[in-house]
């Protein structure tokens, strides 16, 4: 992994390198984790930085992994809320229990977005996922790309997060070690 990171930087030193989506970091410019937690309080606790405590990790017990070094911190997989047709539930899955009421889906999604908005060190999130795939039914859209939900309502929930950072950290002297 170190060699691939170094080669990528040699080819294009301006390009940030994410060595492993969802943690497992060896050498990285972007600290990315996955968190499908649904509860606001747990998400805030997971992603609020505490002095002297390493940030949330998906793989905390692997001593060979890199330590957090001030990289931009992203949750590059969140959401994962399964909305599965009853006829497909035996052959499909999502992250966590299926959501039976559409209004519950919106409430959970909004709580997740509110939680990440409250976490000042989280500089980016990515909802998993845009569309259903063969066996994974976490999409905002069905496999055939038709919407499962009120897309305008989904958009309004995501628009609670600003599209820019009001007080960005000065990362001009930051480098991965």
Can you say where each PLM-predicted feature lies in the sequence?
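Substrate-binding/catalytic cleft of secreted carbohydrate-active enzymes
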Residues: 1-145, 153-157, 167-174
């Amino acid at each position: 992994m170190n060699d691939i990171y170094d080669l990528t930087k040699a080819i294009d030193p301006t390009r940030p390198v994410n060595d492993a989506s969802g943690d497992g970091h060896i050498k990285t410019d972007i600290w990315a984790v996955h968190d499908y937690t649904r509860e606001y309080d747990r998400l805030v606790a997971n992603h609020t930085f505490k002095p002297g405590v390493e940030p949330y990790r998906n793989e905390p017990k692997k001593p060979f992994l890199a330590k957090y070094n001030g990289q931009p911190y992203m949750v590059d997989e969140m959401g994962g809320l399964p909305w599965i047709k009853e006829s497909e539930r035996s052959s499909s899955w999502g992250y966590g229990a299926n959501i039976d009421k559409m209004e519950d889906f919106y409430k959970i999604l909004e709580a997740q977005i509110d939680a990440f908005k409250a976490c000042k060190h989280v500089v980016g999130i990515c909802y998993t996922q845009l569309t259903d795939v063969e066996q994974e039914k976490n999409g905002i859209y069905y496999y055939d790309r038709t919407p499962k939900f009120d897309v305008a309502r989904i958009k309004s929930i995501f628009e609670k997060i600003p599209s820019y950072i009001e007080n960005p950290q000065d990362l001009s002297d930051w480098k991965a070690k």
